[in-house]
Amino acid sequence: MQPRGATELQHEMLEKHVSKELLDQTQICTSIPGKVPIDPNKLNILWQKNSWDQPNLQEFFTNKKRHDEYDWYVFNSHWNYEKFRYAFDIPTEKCVVIKNGIDTFPVRKIYKRGTPIKLIHHCTPWRGLNVLLRAMQEIDNPHIKLDVYSSCKVYGSEFSDNTEKDFEGLYEQAKQLPNVNYIGYKPHEYIKEMMPNYDMFVYPS
């Protein structure tokens, strides 16, 4: 199984909506500098989606002489751009923000008083699943239920094989809670299709 996290999904959308002729003129590297070789005959772009404090970014960004290796730095949020700017003094004239987005807006489910409240959490387990499960233990309303699609498989089989075991305890805890339904990994398309059936998306932060 190949990774299909946010980076891969957005790259798919880029290839879907931008002409091949234009894309062939660029060399796009996502997040980790050097993951894709610099092409001297193309416009080299670093599409940065990771947080500024990731260890595998420090060697490149702390060396200001290397900042000229890319023609453009694209960030997925103003918050992320500002973090990189403050931390590494990157050349602002080479930076642009293109926000994350979606291409489908499902019809929103209208909640009716008295009906069960369905919550969904579909993030990787290190993004607050432990906090969320602790919160669910404090909820004694039988009409509030949480479906958990959390897994490491979104980043591919190799990553999952090396990482999933670290979170088995959390998954088991989710399975034991009466108001939580642990489902595990489902493809992006499935999550999009199911989203209108839920009342809230919960992201503990």
Give each language-model segment a name.
Residues M1-I38:
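N-terminal pre-catalytic "stem/leader" segment of glycosyltransferase-like enzymes
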Residues Q2-P3, C152-F167:
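Short, flexible/disordered intra-domain loops and linkers
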Residues T26-N56, D71-F75, V96-K99:
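Active-site proximal beta-strand in glycosyltransferases
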Residues W52-Y73, F167-A174:
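Membrane-proximal helix-turn-helix segments that form the acceptor-binding/catalytic region
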Residues D71-R85, I90-V107:
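Donor nucleotide-sugar binding/catalytic pocket of nucleotide-sugar-dependent glycosyltransferases
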Residues Y111-G128, L133-E138, D147:
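Conserved donor-binding/catalytic core segment of Leloir-type glycosyltransferases
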Residues S160-E189:
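Nucleotide-activated donor-binding/catalytic signature segment of Leloir-type glycosyltransferases, i.e.
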Residues P196-S205:
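Acidic donor-binding loop of glycosyltransferase active sites
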